[in-house]
């Protein structure tokens, strides 16, 4: 597991899971986050660690946010995923969403307490770099 991990590592007995009786390979779990698959929330509810991270330190929330899946990002945050957890490259989910220009994901992360100054580069610096503005907490 990366230095940031608190959950099980994919491939460990506690990090593997089953979906409808079918065993999922570790990469498949991360693919569900990249694809925005709602079933991932069911897996978390059934015991999959919400802070599960890949070898690069990308959590399920980071992957969902980076790939533009606002509803999944919100669902993971509501289940306790850390919206400020940095990956192995010291990148925060909010900065990734700003970089990818994902306004719905940005709004979700800000609403769940994402720190615009977390990570390198920070979301604030990324927004300035691309001439974008970050919403204020509570703004709609």
List each model region and its residues.
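Specific position within ankyrin or ankyrin-like helical repeats
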Residues: 32-33, 65, 98
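Ankyrin-repeat intra-repeat helix-capping/turn positions
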Residues: 35-36, 68, 101
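Conserved ankyrin/ankyrin-like repeat signature
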Residues: 39-40, 71-72, 104-105, 133-135
């Amino acid at each position: 597991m990366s230095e940031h991990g608190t959950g099980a590592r994919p491939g460990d007995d506690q990090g593997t899971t089953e979906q409808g009786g079918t065993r999922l390979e570790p990469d498949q779990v991360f693919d569900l986050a990249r694809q925005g698959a709602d079933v991932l929330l069911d897996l978390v509810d059934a015991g999959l660690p919400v802070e599960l991270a890949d070898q690069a330190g990308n959590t399920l929330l980071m992957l969902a946010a980076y790939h533009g899946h606002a509803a999944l990002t919100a669902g993971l945050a509501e289940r306790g995923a850390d919206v400020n957890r940095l990956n192995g490259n010291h990148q925060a989910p909010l900065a990734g969403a700003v970089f990818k220009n994902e306004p719905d994901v940005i709004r979700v992360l800000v609403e769940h307490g994402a720190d615009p100054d977390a990570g390198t580069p920070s979301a604030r610096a990324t927004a300035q770099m691309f001439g974008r503005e970050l919403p204020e907490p509570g703004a709609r």
